[in-house]
Amino acid sequence: IERILRYSGYKVGIYTSPHLFNFNERIRVGGQPISDKGIVSFLDHASEEIDKIGSTFFEVTTVMAFEYFKQKKVDIAIIETGLGGRLDATNVISPVISVITSISIDHAEILGDSPEQIALEKAGIIKDKTPVFVYQQDNEVLDIFQKKAIACNADMKISRIPKNINVNSKGTQFTFNNQDYAIPLFGSHQARNAGLAIDVINQFDPHIKYDTIHKALKKVFWPGRMQKIDQRVFYDVSHNKKGME
C-alpha cells in the first residue's frame, strides 16, 4: 500500500513494528526513516509527560510516529497495530480504511489461544461507517469480522485470492482482477498481500491506474522476508509456525 501510494505522488507516512536493524525503521516518511535528531527532539519535548503517566514503550513510539507525521504534513499515514487491535495504542485513530490480514496464533498469552479469540481482538479496529478489507480465510473468523462490521455499519469487503500464482527465482507472479502483476517477494502469501493492497488502493483512490500499481509492486522490498542473501541462502525473520509455513 505504501509503495503504491508513493508512486502515485502521495506523501506517505508509515508506522510498523518491530524493527529489523534499528529503531528508526519503525517511523518513515517518503521511504526515509525518522532521524536520530527527530527521535531525540520528541523525547526531550515529551519526557515529562511520559514519566507522569507511565507510558509504555509502544505507546511512546506510537505518539512519536503521529507527531512526526503531523510535522512532516503527510497526505496519508499507514498505521500497523502492534499487538491485537482492540486495546492497541494505535487504535485511538479514526481511519479512512481498516485492513485485517490473515489470523494466526501469536501472543496467545495476551490475545487468546484460538483464531476466533484473536479475531475478536483484531475486529476492534473496525470503526463506525469505515470501510474494512479482510483476507479470505476461515468462515468462523470471517463471521466475527462480519458481525462487528454490521454492528458498526461498516462496509466489509473480502479480498479474493489471486489466480495463476507462480513463485520462482525472480519473486512471485500472479493475476488479480484479470490483470497480471509481479513482486520481488517470495511466496503465495505475498501475492495475497498484494491483492489485498490493490483492493485497498482501489477503494482509497480509484483514479490510480494499473500501470502505476504494476510498477510500484515490482519495486516492493521488505528485508527479512525470505530475503535472498546469495545463491543458496535465504533469510527470514518469521517467529511463529504460521509465518514459517
Feature locations, PLM:
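Rossmann-fold NAD(P)-dependent oxidoreductase module
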Residues: R3-Y7, K148
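ATP-dependent carboxylate-amine ligase catalytic core
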Residues: Y7-I93, L111, E140
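Short glycine/serine/threonine/alanine-rich loop segments
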Residues: Y10, T130, C152-M156, P206
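Beta-strand->loop->alpha-helix junctions that form or flank phosphate-binding loops
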Residues: Y15-P18, Y135-Q136, K148-N168, P184-S188, ...
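Extended acidic/charged loop-beta regions that coordinate divalent cations
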Residues: P18, T61-I110, L142-D180
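Nucleotide phosphate-binding/pyrophosphate-handling subdomain across enzymes
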Residues: Q71-K72, I76-T81, D88-V99, I103-A108, ...
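Membrane-proximal helix-turn-helix segments that form the acceptor-binding/catalytic region
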Residues: A119-D128
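Short loop-to-beta-strand entry elements in the cores of soluble alpha/beta enzymes
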Residues: K127-Q136
